[in-house]
Amino acid sequence: MQLRLFRRLLLAALLLVIVWTLFGPSGLGEELLSLSLASLLPAPASPGPPLALPRLLIPNQEACSGPGAPPFLLILVCTAPENLNQRNAIRASWGGLREARGLRVQTLFLLGEPNAQHPVWGSQGSDLASESAAQGDILQAAFQDSYRNLTLKTLSGLNWAEKHCPMARYVLKTDDDVYVNVPELVSELVLRGGRWGQWERSTEPQREAEQEGGQVLHSEEVPLLYLGRVHWRVNPSRTPGGRHRVSEEQWPHTWGPFPPYASGTGYVLSASAVQLILKVASRAPLLPLEDVFVGVSARRGGLAPTQCVKLAGATHYPLDRCCYGKFLLTSHRLDPWKMQEAWKLVGGSDGERTAPFCSWFQGVLGILRCRAIAWLQS
């Protein structure tokens, strides 16, 4: 009897360890699974011809320049011309940070041209120019801004990053309804890319790097990284008129499901990954779903996405000081009011905090607690 009880307790403990490994604070199991993808990828495809991208109406070429070290993290926020309230909420919260953990951060907004037929914001071209002059954080390209043009918008942003912000170590692509925990994201990237001292020692040589033939000489290469909330074995939607529809011509059924890709609500690319994707993107099928397109291009380049459970993907997490301050790197579907409430909750408006974000017990439960809160309130 005692032996049977002991076996049951041992089995329960083993199951608990498995669950903790897969879903605990580190998300180690999911990350190991995503890392194993690299060995299954085909050999990298040969580079394609240069991408034919629309010209920039507001190029903002000097956004990453200036005194001091170059940006460690460049954040590109996909927005729409009419979403001024969302942009202002980001500027007044996490997007207003210029430094995190002692490293420079730069946030820019990506958008296209407003629809001239729209009854409310069809004539906002001059408003955007005024906003850009006042804020200095707008990148606008010459294409009609729409959901189906997100791929064009994202590629324009990545291409700008490679040309005008080549010294940035990492690029985060996100949307204007996403809260970003910038300090914790910077910490996460530093841990993945090496010791703090490695970056601190390399900023001075980079700042004074020589330029030969228009090419900036990097003193230290950043390892390839494509980090996000990974979607696995997603089949294309064929629903007529659907927002996420992908036609048979764009992705034939014989190709099967999409390769693994990171949710477009927030994924990080190292500078080397940005260069890789841009090199092979012209040979990838031009899909309207930008996150899928980036995943397909990454696969063609021999790069697999790495799972990060702290990046929320499409999940909306209710406001919680511990989750938003410590364990989450992003949270989706926040309106402008919620964005600023989240910022106040973590003490962002005060510039400092006097108490820990989490209790000891909350810290032990980690990301698992945040997931449970989201599930209970969904």
Curated annotation (Swiss-Prot):
Main site of residence? Golgi
Q: Biological process GO terms, please?
A: ganglioside biosynthetic process; glycosphingolipid biosynthetic process; oligosaccharide biosynthetic process; protein O-linked glycosylation
Instruction: List the ranges whose topology is Lumenal.
Output: 20-378
Cite the entry's keywords alphabetically.
Glycoprotein, Glycosyltransferase, Golgi apparatus, Lipid metabolism, Membrane, Signal-anchor, Transferase, Transmembrane, Transmembrane helix
The record's top EC class is: transferase
Which residues bear sugar attachments? 149
Instruction: State any single GO MF term.
Output: N-acetyl-beta-D-glucosaminide beta-(1,3)-galactosyltransferase activity
Membrane topology qualifier: Single-pass type II membrane protein
Q: Which family does it belong to?
A: Belongs to the glycosyltransferase 31 family.
Listed PANTHER family: BETA-1,3-GALACTOSYLTRANSFERASE 4, BETA-1,3-N-ACETYLGLUCOSAMINYLTRANSFERASE
- Protein known as: Beta-1,3-galactosyltransferase 4
| Organism whose genome encodes this protein | Homo sapiens (Human)
